């Protein structure tokens, strides 16, 4: 090609008018980004304007986007992440929003900006949907994350020793793998709204500024999807619960049992509340009036003394009854109360975190007052307490079977401390204080991480102990109502066959009707050698492996600290023994089941 061939034969562009130059000098980064895109679009259609059509695209800047992930056990982390995503989009930032149950863990290596909102379960473990990512980040194949910027919001309960542990672990591990922190981690307690809003506002402001520096094109402002604007299951929700009526409260353990388990039936007529097997019911409750009187007497406070609670001025007795947490002690309460008590022993307890955690777990608030008397005003005492929070119970019914009812399987918490009888807040309310036709405020808490297979022909294996059998009653009711072809296998454990066989006649009827195809029961105290569900799982290794090869889905419900861990260890033994895999292969197989949503757990 000659020099002449390389010369531009297009006419020279005219000089830019000075007023245009002046206008352009005043544009900010976002306006420049918009204008460049606009000019590019016009250039692409520029033949009519006498401009040459460009044959090759100019390189464009990588779009400024943020991935917002949530790992939720009860739905709180999901709702906070949804709100954060909406806030970022309103600020003109492009957002990719996902729940970790729908997110491929290996994609983390390609992320550039990541926000994670996570709760904590059990003894500091990540929520079920975050397990695969947590294992990847802490395993041999952990990716380098040196191109990632991140921020973490942890949700937890400070009455437990490993407060917000999952959030802390993710935050630390991201940094260890080379990622750069956008914002310091925030750990939010049960009353998380203010902390979560502050974190969201700060991260939105920071990213908006970062987007401007990068001259990124802002995403168009959008309104939240309809599902985020209103409660998905009718207008009633956590903030506006439905005043339901108690239909039945039946003890379903024998008189001789050490356990007091109640079958609770609640009327949802007129609520338009809908739920699916696997969902939970949120229950708001009032504290025991006797406990309120005991506390006020110990403090020497008149019940009629008025304080602020719930945005109102109320007698302190009413406020403690309905607005403050009295049955779950916290480190914050003990640390705040200690200066009023002026007791060296309590000061030593409050100063040692390990001792403090043990003390909080074993000593109810009222018994702190008994042991370490103090005088403080009603306002001062209320200022040490957390707001009352609802309790969540796995729903033990299917609406396909019970219609406008919802059933719960509630273990009443009862114990003695220093000779004084104590009871759980919500379980005591449901079992002892709520009368038939009495009102209980409820809402549905979705649990999309604990769902029956979409294909009802798939077999399911249900593993539960104690009240962990609750969702499986709902599962089998649903399968029976649909006349589902899929086989159902139940593993259930409790101390005694004669005293603790929850829903015995119903399981027998399901088996007779062809909807419970296999069942294995473990009665831990009916013989000298204790037998648990994990032992039954190992006994049935070949059968379980065969069901897995047929596409079975496995569900586990129960105690996270002990039972769920022991069951997972047993499942790994099954995969190693019957599946002929080594330990690493078994772990990978179980992770594959998790990612395929064929291994789901509802643990607490």
Curated annotation (Swiss-Prot):
<feature type="binding site">
    <location>
        <begin position="530"/>
        <end position="534"/>
    </location>
    <ligand>
        <name>NADP(+)</name>
    </ligand>
</feature>
<dbReference type="InterPro" id="IPR023173">
    <property type="entry name" value="NADPH_Cyt_P450_Rdtase_alpha"/>
</dbReference>
<dbReference type="GO" id="GO:0019344">
    <property type="term" value="P:cysteine biosynthetic process"/>
</dbReference>
<keyword id="KW-0560">Oxidoreductase</keyword>
<dbReference type="GO" id="GO:0005829">
    <property type="term" value="C:cytosol"/>
</dbReference>
<comment type="function">
    <text>Component of the sulfite reductase complex that catalyzes the 6-electron reduction of sulfite to sulfide. This is one of several activities required for the biosynthesis of L-cysteine from sulfate. The flavoprotein component catalyzes the electron flow from NADPH -&gt; FAD -&gt; FMN to the hemoprotein component.</text>
</comment>
<dbReference type="InterPro" id="IPR008254">
    <property type="entry name" value="Flavodoxin/NO_synth"/>
</dbReference>
<protein>
    <recommendedName>
        <fullName>Sulfite reductase [NADPH] flavoprotein alpha-component</fullName>
        <ecNumber>1.8.1.2</ecNumber>
    </recommendedName>
</protein>
<dbReference type="Pfam" id="PF00258">
    <property type="entry name" value="Flavodoxin_1"/>
</dbReference>
<dbReference type="InterPro" id="IPR001709">
    <property type="entry name" value="Flavoprot_Pyr_Nucl_cyt_Rdtase"/>
</dbReference>
<feature type="binding site">
    <location>
        <begin position="391"/>
        <end position="394"/>
    </location>
    <ligand>
        <name>FAD</name>
    </ligand>
</feature>
<dbReference type="InterPro" id="IPR003097">
    <property type="entry name" value="CysJ-like_FAD-binding"/>
</dbReference>
<comment type="similarity">
    <text>In the N-terminal section; belongs to the flavodoxin family.</text>
</comment>
<keyword id="KW-0249">Electron transport</keyword>
<dbReference type="GO" id="GO:0070814">
    <property type="term" value="P:hydrogen sulfide biosynthetic process"/>
</dbReference>
<dbReference type="Pfam" id="PF00175">
    <property type="entry name" value="NAD_binding_1"/>
</dbReference>
<dbReference type="InterPro" id="IPR017927">
    <property type="entry name" value="FAD-bd_FR_type"/>
</dbReference>
<keyword id="KW-0028">Amino-acid biosynthesis</keyword>
<feature type="binding site">
    <location>
        <begin position="119"/>
        <end position="122"/>
    </location>
    <ligand>
        <name>FMN</name>
    </ligand>
</feature>
<dbReference type="InterPro" id="IPR010199">
    <property type="entry name" value="CysJ"/>
</dbReference>
<dbReference type="InterPro" id="IPR017938">
    <property type="entry name" value="Riboflavin_synthase-like_b-brl"/>
</dbReference>
<comment type="subunit">
    <text>Alpha(8)-beta(8). The alpha component is a flavoprotein, the beta component is a hemoprotein.</text>
</comment>
<dbReference type="GO" id="GO:0000103">
    <property type="term" value="P:sulfate assimilation"/>
</dbReference>
<feature type="binding site">
    <location>
        <begin position="155"/>
        <end position="164"/>
    </location>
    <ligand>
        <name>FMN</name>
    </ligand>
</feature>
<feature type="domain" description="FAD-binding FR-type">
    <location>
        <begin position="239"/>
        <end position="453"/>
    </location>
</feature>
<dbReference type="InterPro" id="IPR001433">
    <property type="entry name" value="OxRdtase_FAD/NAD-bd"/>
</dbReference>
<feature type="binding site">
    <location>
        <begin position="524"/>
        <end position="525"/>
    </location>
    <ligand>
        <name>NADP(+)</name>
    </ligand>
</feature>
<dbReference type="GO" id="GO:0004783">
    <property type="term" value="F:sulfite reductase (NADPH) activity"/>
</dbReference>
<dbReference type="InterPro" id="IPR029039">
    <property type="entry name" value="Flavoprotein-like_sf"/>
</dbReference>
<feature type="binding site">
    <location>
        <position position="566"/>
    </location>
    <ligand>
        <name>NADP(+)</name>
    </ligand>
</feature>
<feature type="binding site">
    <location>
        <begin position="424"/>
        <end position="427"/>
    </location>
    <ligand>
        <name>FAD</name>
    </ligand>
</feature>
<feature type="binding site">
    <location>
        <begin position="409"/>
        <end position="411"/>
    </location>
    <ligand>
        <name>FAD</name>
    </ligand>
</feature>
<dbReference type="InterPro" id="IPR039261">
    <property type="entry name" value="FNR_nucleotide-bd"/>
</dbReference>
<comment type="pathway">
    <text>Sulfur metabolism; hydrogen sulfide biosynthesis; hydrogen sulfide from sulfite (NADPH route): step 1/1.</text>
</comment>
<feature type="binding site">
    <location>
        <position position="361"/>
    </location>
    <ligand>
        <name>FAD</name>
    </ligand>
</feature>
<keyword id="KW-0521">NADP</keyword>
<comment type="similarity">
    <text>Belongs to the NADPH-dependent sulphite reductase flavoprotein subunit CysJ family.</text>
</comment>
<dbReference type="GO" id="GO:0050660">
    <property type="term" value="F:flavin adenine dinucleotide binding"/>
</dbReference>
<dbReference type="Pfam" id="PF00667">
    <property type="entry name" value="FAD_binding_1"/>
</dbReference>
<feature type="binding site">
    <location>
        <position position="604"/>
    </location>
    <ligand>
        <name>FAD</name>
    </ligand>
</feature>
<dbReference type="GO" id="GO:0010181">
    <property type="term" value="F:FMN binding"/>
</dbReference>
<feature type="binding site">
    <location>
        <begin position="72"/>
        <end position="77"/>
    </location>
    <ligand>
        <name>FMN</name>
    </ligand>
</feature>
